[in-house]
Amino acid sequence: WPDDDIAKVLKNGWCATFVYHCCMQIGFSLPIRVPNSPCRLAGVNAWYQWSKAANLFTKDSATFLPARGDIVIYRNIVPPEKKDDVNTPTDHMGIVVFVDQNGFQAAEGNIGNENMSGVIHRKHHVNIEGFIRIDGKYEYDGWKYDYKSGEIRTEPFTPTVPV
């Protein structure tokens, strides 16, 4: 990440970084941060904001069935004494790997802010904010944003290469 102090900022909060890494490994091109926002996709709230703005987020409901590959965003699943910011309800995330009628299994990094990863079974509709589904229609548009100035480009960005 571009910040020198990112390890201090994230502390043990690396579930979003785990999800980001998994997405990059399978070939998704994702922005590093939410355009015109201080949020980076190293944090759950940034994923929440970004996915809503990109129309990739579906709020949890009895009519929505998650599928393998969906990204799940949890709400108040981390105990308050282990949270860095108790005012942020979207506090954990993972990747759905299996769905059954009782719930789903998700691959998660930093489960319960205990600095460990694993595959864990979660019940449907319990502490779930919603799901991000990045389908074949998703197209990376990060080139449109100048993250330093906040300006929106209208032409594709071509970096200059020193000769």
Where are these regions (language model features)?
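N-terminal capping segments
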Residues: 1-32, 155-163
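Short linear interaction motif-like sites in intrinsically disordered regions of transcription factors
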Residues: 2, 15, 48-51, 144
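A generic structural signal for solvent-exposed, polar alpha-helical segments
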Residues: 7, 20, 24, 53-56, ...
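...with weaker cross-activation on analogous glycine-rich loops/strands in unrelated enzymes
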Residues: 7-12, 29-114
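Alpha-helix initiation/capping motif
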Residues: 15, 43, 123-126
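Aromatic- and glycine-rich peptidoglycan recognition patches
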Residues: 76-163
